[in-house]
UniProtKB/Swiss-Prot annotation:
Entry's Gene Ontology BP terms: cysteinyl-tRNA aminoacylation
Reaction it catalyzes: tRNA(Cys) + L-cysteine + ATP = L-cysteinyl-tRNA(Cys) + AMP + diphosphate
Protein name as annotated: Cysteine--tRNA ligase
Organism from which the protein derives: Trichodesmium erythraeum (strain IMS101)
Residues reported to bind Zn(2+): C29, C215, H240, E244
Length: 489
């Protein structure tokens, strides 16, 4: 089965075919660095990181570029509010972005172009659009002339005539004169300098670039005139991505991207996330509660990337449980290896012969279906639960039902596929994760103490021990004859 992706441009799923064999050029719109990243950012960058990981796993060389918008009205507003400079605000929140993404196990991009580092390229692109009749200057500003681009609206499906009808009565000649535009739908490529704001010299006077032109210039500089994948949140379809297409394609005469991909929104308890509603949650606030970063990543992956996802306490609790199941499977040889004679399991990961083909095929089928991560997770759960069952059998019967060689195959397959989804237990955490919980010997000792308490009719003590074990994620199953089985939840 070939990889199929939903292309926002054509509004249908298409078989993915790269421009060049085995090479993929991918551009993702990055953050405007004026505040800490929120759950919407987590959803977006985990989604594209997962897609990138899968493409690499499939053997592609992925050239992944993601920009930073480091000059913008929001950054300037934040600088004024905090009495600092635009550069210091941008630097602070760029560093915060990297900290958050590292915790979420999002791979770094191959390149992070910044708007302020590409002023010359931006000006050259604006000048080219002006020469070709797609842009005009007006009082120090430069605007894109939307009606000159006949395909405007092809991504968003919006028609100028419909937008104009919707705007009727809201734009009059005085507004147009004030805005210095020929048409209310024209948008700024270059903004004339304002007192106290950063500005650069240009053929149109001192000023700074508009938002949309930045990405067009950086895509061309880093990846060329036509790329394979352009991705971002669904909120960027209009006007940002629509305007990018208008700028780039008017300049080059070539399509900007073959595939336009957009991730769905995050809601909080069914409501749109916003500061005004008081339900705005940053990544770091959530992780500092603490929520395991991999549980947050798991939460994002439980929905296919194009679908909306609702953040609730129940959803994050379910994601925590899901991650604990997979983590337990990943830690299986570190916990049970000594009893099985399984030494240095990490060495097995490089042995491709240990990968179970049937699971690989099911995983690939799921991911080829427009990166269907919920279906892919189901395959990981199947492997992890099999390993959990074998661990419980080993504890109670002293041996596993499955051979060591087969257990190795299940484990290597689980770890390999988990890595494709970015779900990993760091090496330095492997021992500590086991030691954080009760050891098997400690559990058996407490069960024996509970049995003795019950024999002495000290039921309050027996209940206390049961509750203590339950708080540690240990479920007890009392059998006839005074036997108690247990397993980790």
């Amino acid at each position: 089965m070939a990889l199929k992706l939903y292309n926002s441009l054509t509004r249908q799923e298409e078989t993915f075919e790269p421009l060049e064999p085995n090479i993929i050029k991918m551009y993702v719109c990055g953050v405007t660095v004026y505040d800490y990243c929120h759950l919407g950012h987590a959803r977006s960058y985990i989604a594209w990181d997962t897609m990138r990981r899968y493409l690499i796993w499939q053997g592609y060389q992925v050239r992944y570029v993601q920009n930073f918008t480091d000059i913008d009205d929001k950054i300037l507003k934040r600088a004024r509010e905090t009495g600092s400079s635009m550069d210091s605000v941008a630097k602070r929140f760029t560093e915060a972005y990297f900290e958050d993404m590292k915790r979420l196990n999002v791979l770094e991009a191959d390149e992070y172009p910044r708007a302020t580092q590409n002023i010359d390229r931006i000006q050259n692109l604006i000048h080219d659009l002006e020469k070709k009749g797609f842009a005009y200057s007006s009082g120090g500003d430069v605007y894109y002339q939307v009606r000159e681009f006949s395909q405007y609206g092809k991504l968003s499906g919006r028609r100028l005539e419909e937008m104009q009808a919707g705007a009727s009565g809201r734009v009059d000649s005085e507004d147009l004169e004030t805005a210095k535009k020929k048409d209310p739908f024209d948008f700024a490529l270059w903004k004339a300098a304002k007192t106290g704001e950063p500005a650069w010299d240009s053929p149109w006077g001192k000023g700074r670039p508009g938002w949309h032109i930045e990405c067009s210039a950086m895509v061309q500089d880093c990846l060329g005139e036509t790329i394979d994948i352009h991705a971002g949140g669904a909120d960027l379809i209009f006007p940002h991505h629509e305007n990018e297409i208008a700028q780039s394609e008017a300049s080059t005469g070539k399509i900007l991207a073959r595939y336009w991909l957009h991730n769905g929104f995050v809601t909080i308890n069914g409501e749109k996330m916003s500061k005004s509603l008081g339900n705005f949650t940053t990544i770091r606030d959530l992780l500092d509660q603490p929520v395991d970063p991999m549980a947050l990543r798991m939460f994002v992956l439980t929905a296919q990337y194009r679908k909306p996802i609702d953040f609730t306490e129940e959803a994050i609790a379910s994601a925590k449980n899901g991650w604990n199941t997979i983590k337990e499977g990943i830690l299986f040889p570190y916990q049970y290896g000594p009893k099985l004679g399984w030494e240095m399991p990490a060495k097995n990961l490089s042995d491709q012969t240990l990968l179970l083909t049937s699971y690989l095929e099911k995983f690939q089928k799921a991911m080829d279906d427009d990166i269907n991560t919920p279906a892919a997770l189901a395959i990981l759960f199947e492997l992890a639960k099999d390993l959990r069952r074998e661990g419980n059998v080993l504890i109670h019967e002293g041996k596993t039902e499955t051979s060591l060689e087969e257990l190795k195959k299940q484990w290597v397959t689980l770890v390999s596929l988990s890595q494709v989804l970015g779900l990993e237990v760091k090496i330095e955490e492997q021992v500590s994760n086991i030691s954080e919980g009760l050891s098997n010997i400690e559990i058996e000792s407490l069960i024996q103490q509970r049995l003795e308490a019950k024999k002495a009719k000290n039921y309050s003590e027996a209940d206390r021990i049961r509750n203590e074990l339950q708080s540690q994620g240990i479920k007890l199953i009392d059998k006839s004859g005074g036997l108690t089985n247990w397993h980790r939840n």
